Curated annotation (Swiss-Prot):
Comp. bias (Basic and acidic residues): 1-12, 184-194
Keyword Ribonucleoprotein: no
Similarity field: Belongs to the HYLS1 family.
Name of the coding gene: hyls-1
Consequence of changing residue 249 to G: Exhibits little ability to rescue cilia formation in xhyls-1-depleted embryos
Name of this chain's protein: Centriolar and ciliogenesis-associated protein HYLS1
Gene Ontology biological-process annotations: cilium assembly
Role noted for this protein: Plays an important role in ciliogenesis. Required for apical targeting/anchoring of centrioles at the plasma membrane.
Observed phenotype of the null mutant: Morpholino knockdown results in a specific loss of cilia, with no effect on the number of cells with multiple basal bodies or the number of basal bodies per cell.
Keyword Oxidoreductase in record: no
Length: 331
């Protein structure tokens, strides 16, 4: 007889089930039948243990605890209707996870069958299993292995997920940080690369053994995460020192500018030569223009000796030379 059975025999718990095999099963959320224990194919002890494991593992979560944990995760305001829906789904997942713990139940049944006494060992009763659903690790010192160990020890809805066949499977993956990077190739095409931190091949094989969990994170890249190669940051084609030298090299920059200027001057000189040769060809091909001849016009200039007072002035001059006194009038 084990030490647990002795303690239970000496100090029976208030939650211990009656040992009468003809009693009826209590009405629970998962079992609504009222058949005697004798009608089942198994023995009474195993039925008592399985009944105790299924009936008392029904967990509930209060709204205060749910709001407190959501506030720790960053969701400060959640509507009451959405909170009630989330609470209902959470309790359903917790109860399903508790019912899926079949190895522990089978071990307890084997121990009860091997013992000579009919007293089943007491099982711990949890009124609330919300404390088992901890938030994501907030410290950077926590490694992925510690997170995996912590997830192994936990027995809550965070440890289970729904597979393709509807079975409940345990996952031990730590949260991944996915970063999409848009890179441009030399030919002008763009390529989206995934630089998330992926698991190693051994860890992926251990986690995916016996499970068919659907991974929706690789739908954007068109291939599953198992076939996705490890991403890497492409090294630069030249170092930063070469970039600095290329920027601050005055001689190289002068040579580059000189080559560009010479190429530009050659193009301009070629254009000017073509223009000059075109003008010269036009001048050589055109006939000579005749010289313009001036038109002779009659001279309309009047000589001063032909004026009207010329005769009068000449008479006065003649009289003055000869000493003749002028007369009153010259007619």
């Amino acid at each position: 007889m084990s030490l647990r059975d002795r303690q239970f025999r000496e100090e029976p718990s208030e939650n211990a089930l009656p040992l009468d095999r003809n009693h009826f099963r209590p009405s629970t959320e998962y079992d609504q039948s009222y058949e005697p224990l004798e009608a089942s194919g198994q023995s009474g002890d195993s039925d008592l243990v399985s009944e105790y494991a299924q009936g008392n593992m029904s967990v509930t979560v209060s709204e205060e605890e749910l709001r407190h944990e959501l506030s720790l995760l960053g969701f400060s305001y959640v509507p009451r209707q959405r909170l009630l829906e989330f609470k209902k789904d959470l309790e359903r997942l917790m109860n399903r996870g508790s019912a899926a713990a079949s190895p522990e139940t089978s071990r307890l049944e084997n121990e009860s069958l091997d013992d000579s006494t009919n007293t089943p060992p007491p099982l711990p009763i949890e009124t609330s299993a919300w404390h088992q659903t901890s938030a994501w690790p907030t410290t950077t010192s926590t490694s992925s292995k510690e997170w995996d160990n912590q997830q192994r020890n936990q027995d809550s809805y965070t440890k289970h997920t729904v597979s393709l066949g509807g079975n409940v499977q345990a996952t031990k993956k730590a949260p991944q940080i996915t970063r999409k990077v848009l890179r441009r190739k030399s030919d002008g095409q763009t390529h989206v690369s995934d630089e998330s931190f992926l698991y190693s091949e051994t860890e992926t094989e251990e986690e995916d053994t016996g499970s068919s969990i659907v991974d929706f994170r690789s739908e954007s890249s068109g291939r599953s995460s198992a076939s996705c190669a490890k991403s890497f940051i492409r090294p630069p084609l030249y170092s930063l020192l070469d970039q600095y030298r290329q920027r601050s090299d005055p001689v190289g920059r002068y040579q580059e500018y000189k080559q560009k200027w010479d190429a530009l001057q050659g193009a301009l000189e070629r254009n000017r030569k073509e223009l000059r040769w075109g003008i010269r060809e036009q001048m050589m091909s055109a006939p000579p223009q005749p010289a313009a001849r001036s038109v002779l016009l009659p001279n309309t200039y009047v000589i001063p000796t032909d004026k009207k007072r010329y005769a009068l002035r000449w008479a006065v001059r003649r009289d003055l030379v000869n000493g003749v006194m002028p007369r009153g009038s010259y007619s």
